[in-house]
Amino acid sequence: MQETLKQLETEAIAKVEAASSLKEVNDIRVQYLGKKGPITEVLRGMGKLSAEERPKMGALANEVREQIAGAIAEKNEQLEKEEVKKKLASQTIDVTLPANPIKIGARHPLTIVVEDIEDLFIGMGYTVEEGPEVETDYYNFEALNLPKEHPARDMQDSFYITEDTLLRTQTSPVQARTLEKYKGQGPVKIICPGKVYRRDSDDATHSHQFMQIEGLVVDHNISMSDLKGTLETVARKMFGEDREIRLRPSFFPFTEPSVEVDVSCFKCGGKGCSVCKGTGWIEILGAGMVHPNVLKMSGFDPETYQGFAFGMGVERIAMLKYGIDDIRHFYTNDIRFTKQFKQD
């Protein structure tokens, strides 16, 4: 029996070493180590052995099984490595070939417009200021010459959080806060971009949340001509170098005098079309000279300092600039919309 086991070990290991595929190795494993294999048959015959021989033969049989199993495992590992090498050799990849292009996103059109305007004003010596979107009643209204019970407050329906705090209805509070920081000493040249909130019903031209950019200049000897020159620069930067602007008298509580600013239609050149509704002009923003009361409440002497301010809706500028007909497109999170503004 001992000789038989050793012979089986030698045969099995020789066949394993000669095998050229994983299937052959598996067949050898089943042939020699399976339930119907010769080693199992030998073990079944151990009952005929004496009590002294039985442990020795059992140990030998286990040793033979381990030797064969070890040879099989080693051969499997060798063949698997060879198979991987063959696959790699047959599936050679040219690493110099261009890969699949990575999908690159596009900046939102509102971001593009805000950054363009910021770059323009920074180049003119302005700084960018920001403020809280949850604002106090004082900075949103009173510091801007809209005291309690002022009739102009009815012009804006607001989202109040408490009796004295609300979501800001304009970015003008940033101007009031900034003026206070200067403690009555100019010059001040700032723009204030940010989100604002009003209780409007959402439709093609209105949104309960939108973006504004306001500008403020306070210094000695500031006049309406300075305001007009600044706004002409903005209009030509945003809508083309041949644009003209006109100022129409208006009313805002925080400026005096106040004006609405129109730009000559960039589609028809002022001849009249559907974009400008036949007038040749398109309204783009409101502006005016800073009201003396606003200067006083912020610590500036209106006898010594003057200033101008202006405010524009970013969505309106973007809609005009890119020919967008519905403000709701800006907030639908539709990648097909933003992809149209992809820049190289």
From Swiss-Prot:
Broad enzyme group: ligase
UniProt binding sites for Mg(2+): 256
Bound cofactor: record note: Binds 2 magnesium ions per tetramer.
Molecular functions (GO terms): ATP binding; catalytic activity, acting on a protein; magnesium ion binding; phenylalanine-tRNA ligase activity; transferase activity; tRNA binding
CDD domains tied to this protein: PheRS_alpha_core (cd00496)
Keywords for this protein: Aminoacyl-tRNA synthetase, ATP-binding, Cytoplasm, Ligase, Magnesium, Metal-binding, Nucleotide-binding, Protein biosynthesis
EC number: 6.1.1.20
Cofactor: Mg(2+)
GO cellular component, one term: cytoplasm
Subcellular locations according to the entry: Cytoplasm
PROSITE patterns: AA_TRNA_LIGASE_II
UniProt KW Cell cycle keyword: no
Presence of keyword Secreted: no
Taxonomy, superkingdom: Bacteria
Catalytic activity: tRNA(Phe) + L-phenylalanine + ATP = L-phenylalanyl-tRNA(Phe) + AMP + diphosphate + H(+)
GO biological process: phenylalanyl-tRNA aminoacylation
NCBIfam families registered for this protein in UniProt: pheS
The protein's assembly and partners: Tetramer of two alpha and two beta subunits.
Family per similarity comment: Belongs to the class-II aminoacyl-tRNA synthetase family. Phe-tRNA synthetase alpha subunit type 1 subfamily.
UniProt name for this protein: Phenylalanine--tRNA ligase alpha subunit
Protein's organism: Bacillus pumilus (strain SAFR-032)
Taxonomy of the source species: Bacteria, Bacillati, Bacillota, Bacilli, Bacillales
Underlying gene: pheS
